[in-house]
Amino acid sequence: MRKMKKRYPDLHFDFHAHNDYDLAVSNVLAAVLSGVKGLHTTINGLGERAGNAPLASVQAILKDHFHAITRIDESRLNDVSRVVESYSGVTIPANKPIVGESVFTQVAGVHADGDNKNKLYFNDLLPERFGRVREYALGKKFRESQHPQKSGEYGTGTG
């Protein structure tokens, strides 16, 4: 793409990535770095064969790593993804970045404990940003001291 941009500097180039090798988002980012301005993305990565670059993932990376300003309302991405899931009949994998059911669930343990210690394991992917909430689940490393609210909720409390 960089050679094309250099050869035709006044042209507006778009980029359309397929996810056949699970690299659609990476390829979109490479296109951005080469100067492409138009990006083709889809909700939930739906598209031919293995799909296309998912809008939610591309948006998050553009904002967090490129400090790009877009007109995407991130707080609506989850709702839009659920509508598309419903109409398309294609289930969103639970671990799909940004919109998957379990991506903002911390299993009580080391990471959950870090949440209680001034966001020790902080990153920019806060669930509230995407219209979601952080959830906690009990795991084999659960300790009451980490999440006393869960102790009472699950009847494991000592009080």
Each model region followed by its residue ranges:
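Alpha-helix-loop-beta-strand connector modules within alpha/beta enzyme cores
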Residues: 1-15, 60-65
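Active-site beta-loop-alpha junctions enriched in small/polar residues
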Residues: 16-22, 44
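Glycine-rich phosphate-binding active-site loops on the catalytic face of alpha/beta enzymes
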Residues: 36-51
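Catalytic cores of alpha/beta
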Residues: 21-34
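Conserved, mostly hydrophobic/aromatic
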Residues: 35, 58, 151
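A mid-to-C-terminal "edge-of-domain" accessory segment
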Residues: 67-159
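C-terminal helical cap(s) of enzyme catalytic domains, especially alpha/beta-barrels
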Residues: 47-77, 81
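Structural preference for beta-strand elements that scaffold enzyme active sites
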Residues: 10-16, 38, 135-137
